[in-house]
Curated annotation (Swiss-Prot):
The gene is queF. This is NADPH-dependent 7-cyano-7-deazaguanine reductase. Belongs to the GTP cyclohydrolase I family. QueF type 2 subfamily. The active site is at 187 (thioimide intermediate), 194 (proton donor). Catalyzes the NADPH-dependent reduction of 7-cyano-7-deazaguanine (preQ0) to 7-aminomethyl-7-deazaguanine (preQ1). GO terms for biological process: queuosine biosynthetic process; tRNA modification. Keywords: Cytoplasm, NADP, Oxidoreductase, Queuosine biosynthesis. It is an enzyme of class 1 (oxidoreductase). It comes from Actinobacillus succinogenes (strain ATCC 55618 / DSM 22257 / CCUG 43843 / 130Z). It is found in: Cytoplasm.
Length: 279
């Protein structure tokens, strides 16, 4: 068992677990970011200087001081510079532990989640608790950019291959945004499918759309966490296309009442958390 396997062996993901309905901050489990970043050759000097893992938590409930159940939806933004990412099933179990616990106010719930996540990931975390009414005037969002999915190409190999991006540019300078709804990877632990929409914004030599789409499709049988996939895509495009500016943003469909939306960039700030049609 290697160092990576040792670090992941204690995670609750993929294991039979009991649901604790009483608040328990120890349920949160960290995964060191350095494990995957070492594999990508990312040192302390990271190729991106803006970024976050943007979570939406749809299943939050607790009891008010009189014992009446309360509900909310939360946005959580975990800074990319944090030492750890949070394992998704442990986050779900942690949130479930609020179900039969009394809190004085929604603000106390929000502050508790923020504090516990910061302790888990060892970095900056922003949390905002929203009422259901907040979403009444929040329309389904669409990521801006040119869709590259409708290409008439034949694909027979679905193994991950970064070399599909070899010689992927031409000597035409552009600033453009490309979008694909065909991102699909698999959970590193369970192998369950993770479905996402990918946005790539860059400035530099024009990237060949066919090669880029083949590369995206090659994640189809690749096992890695959401955050790790986005950082891998960022590093591969930076290596093969050498853009002057680059943003990689993926919005994944929800599982277990949570969706994860990693954002990495070397030139623009983290966007707001706006739900797509598949979310």
């Amino acid at each position: 068992m290697n160092r990576y396997d040792n670090s992941l062996s204690g995670l609750k993901l993929g294991q039979k677990t009991e649901y604790n309905a009483k608040y328990d901050r120890t349920l949160l489990q960290p995964v060191p970011r350095r494990l995957n970043r070492d594999d990508l050759g990312i040192s302390a000097q990271q190729p991106f200087n803006q970024g976050a893992d943007i979570w939406t938590a749809y299943e939050i409930s607790w009891l008010n001081p009189k014992g009446l159940p309360q509900i909310a939806i939360a946005d959580a933004e975990i800074d990319f510079r944090s030492e750890n990412l949070v394992e998704s099933k442990s986050f779900k179990l942690y949130l479930n532990s609020f179900n039969q616990t009394k809190f004085a106010s929604p603000a106390e719930v929000q502050d508790t989640i923020r504090r516990d996540l910061q302790d888990c990931v060892q970095g900056e975390v922003k949390v905002r608790l929203n009422s259901v009414a907040f979403y009444t005037h929040q329309p389904i969002h669409e990521l801006s950019g040119e869709i590259i999915d409708n290409q008439d190409i034949e694909i027979s190999d679905y193994g991950f291959n970064a070399e599909l991006l070899t010689n992927c540019t031409c000597d035409v300078q552009v600033e453009e945004t490309l979008v694909s709804h065909l991102l699909k990877s698999n959970c590193l632990i369970t192998g369950q499918p993770d479905w996402g929409t990918l946005q790539i914004r860059y400035a530099g030599n024009r990237i060949d759309r066919e090669k880029l789409l083949r590369y995206i499709v090659s994640f189809r049988q690749h096992n890695e966490f959401h955050e790790q996939c986005v950082e891998r895509i960022f590093c591969d495009i930076l290596h093969y296309a050498e853009p002057e500016k680059l943003t990689v943003y993926a919005r994944y469909t929800r599982r277990g009442g949570l969706d994860i939306n990693p954002f990495r960039s070397n030139f623009e700030p983290v966007p707001g958390n706006f739900r797509l049609a598949r979310q």
